[in-house]
């Protein structure tokens, strides 16, 4: 992971110098390391879910950085997907059916190496809506798509949830982890069907516009997933030293300040937060003899010893990070989904000779 950070650090530095190019090789490599194919360009970005904003502001739990405490599941990536489905027209009376909606969420951004630990569907109504009448909800998983012009067959669906509810100032949440896990394979993602009925007492056995209008006007659906990328996860972390390093000569290997401003690399339109971060970098000489302050490895100590004897044949050790820490990024991906992701080894805390 230290090698990955060094690559990211170098690419960030090069981007600061070469940002005049539309998309440089360094930027493509950096975006790939961040799990993106191209630079996102959100046109009509979705609002950031409060749950993601709260997790970002709370920060990473240094003792357990790969646990999403807000959801109680392992993970270091949270994505919020907007519904790309459509509302079906109800042309003929169908009892007390108020709404039929096809839901579709594109999970193609989830990589094969990720372990999906939570899939949560949210059905939200306008916040100032309050109606006391009761409705009935049925949620189906589509097993097979119907041909255009053909009736939706009940044989092509599987009932997942049935629930009664009232329109209150809160959302409805449903655990769809198993379904979302299957959707990592696009061939299995046929979407969902949501049906909402008015209670038969209020609807009088037939659909009533007055009763159904609140549902049709104010419904909003989204899907949230939590996944774990094992390659970007450390289960144990040494606690950061609280004492400050003693003064050192300016040419000796040590941590130097480097602030990365995402506006400087042209990323301000898709990176939601932070606006930038203190990345730092390592620079300086590793002279003989290495002192304890330089945190040299055994190999580096031997290398400096050999260099003192044969300076022309053996170079001095390199100044490199010996301790790094993670950051969280909140951003829009290539599908305009909101993503919260923890990245290991993005901040240099200490440097040494290697």
Swiss-Prot record:
Q: Name its cellular compartments.
A: Secreted; Cytoplasm
The record's keywords, sorted A to Z, are: Cleavage on pair of basic residues, Cytokine, Cytoplasm, Developmental protein, Disulfide bond, Glycoprotein, Growth factor, Secreted, Signal
Principal localization?
secreted
Q: List the disulfide bonds.
A: 253-319, 282-351, 286-353
One Gene Ontology term, aspect cellular component: extracellular region
Which molecular-function annotations from GO does this UniProt entry contain? cytokine activity; growth factor activity; morphogen activity; protein homodimerization activity
One of its GO biological process terms is:
regulation of nodal signaling pathway
Can you tell me which family this protein belongs to? Answer: Belongs to the TGF-beta family.
What this protein is called in its record is Growth/differentiation factor 3
Native source organism of the sequence = Xenopus laevis (African clawed frog)
The gene for this chain is gdf3
């Amino acid at each position: 992971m230290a090698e990955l950070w060094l690559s990211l650090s170098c690419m960030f530095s090069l981007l600061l110098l070469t940002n005049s190019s539309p998309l440089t090789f360094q930027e493509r490599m950096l975006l790939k390391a961040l799990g993106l194919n191209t630079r996102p360009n959100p046109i009509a970005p979705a609002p950031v879910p409060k749950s993601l904003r709260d997790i970002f502001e709370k920060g990473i739990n240094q003792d357990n950085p790969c646990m999403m405490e807000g959801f109680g599941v392992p993970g270091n990536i949270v994505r919020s997907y907007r519904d790309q489905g459509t509302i079906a027209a109800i042309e003929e009376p169908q009892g007390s059916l108020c709404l039929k909606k096809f839901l579709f969420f594109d999970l193609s951004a989830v990589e094969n190496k990720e372990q999906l630990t939570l899939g949560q569907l949210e059905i939200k109504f306008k916040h100032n809506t309050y109606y006391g009448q009761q409705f009935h909800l049925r949620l189906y998983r589509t097993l097979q798509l119907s041909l255009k012009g053909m009736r939706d067959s009940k044989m092509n669906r599987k009932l997942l949830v049935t629930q009664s509810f009232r329109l209150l100032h809160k959302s409805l949440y449903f655990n769809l982890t198993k379904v979302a896990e299957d959707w990592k394979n696009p061939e299995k993602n046929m979407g969902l069907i949501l049906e909402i009925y008015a209670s038969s007492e209020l609807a009088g056995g037939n659909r009533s516009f007055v009763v159904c209008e609140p549902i049709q006007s104010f419904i909003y659906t989204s899907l949230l997933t939590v996944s774990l990328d094992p390659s970007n996860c450390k289960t144990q972390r040494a606690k950061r030293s609280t004492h400050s390093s003693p003064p050192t000569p300016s040419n000796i290997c040590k941590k130097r300040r480097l602030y990365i401003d995402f506006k400087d690399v042209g990323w301000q339109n898709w990176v939601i937060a932070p606006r930038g971060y203190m990345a730092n970098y390592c620079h300086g000489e590793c002279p003989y003899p290495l002192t304890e302050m330089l945190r040299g490895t055994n190999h580096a100590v031997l290398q400096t010893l050999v260099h003192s004897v044969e300076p022309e044949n053996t170079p001095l050790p390199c100044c490199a990070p010996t301790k790094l820490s993670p950051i969280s990024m909140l951003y829009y991906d290539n599908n305009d989904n909101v993503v919260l992701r923890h990245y290991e080894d993005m901040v240099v805390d200490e440097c040494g000779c290697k």
